[in-house]
Amino acid sequence: TPLFTKEKHMATIEVSGKNYETDEEGYLVNLAEWNEDVGTYLAQTESVEMTEQHWEVVNFLRDYYNEFQIAPAVRVLTKAIGKKLGADKGTSQYLYDLFPYGPAKQACKIAGLPKPTGCV
């Protein structure tokens, strides 16, 4: 048995009259419950005003996660975005302009995905 356990504290957010469970950092617990209204709400909690460019990245992350069951590290995300959305968008500067507190971490939160681990 472990000497100590770190208990995850849950919270609830209400979006459009429906409750959604989040972890202590505001990441959605059940990614299947995500929708654009939830994404918009989570973006507001991160002080991100969603534009078409933000949604491109968020939808890309959701597709990537559905295919690989993991969120990409920033380097992988940058390369993949460049291939799919164009070289001008495949730069870390572009992604940091959209998500100033970290493209992987912040965009994953808005996309309803688990917090990325490792090198983000």
Give the positions of each predicted feature.
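Short, Lys/Arg-enriched N-terminal segments with co-localized hydrophobic residues
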Residues: 1-9
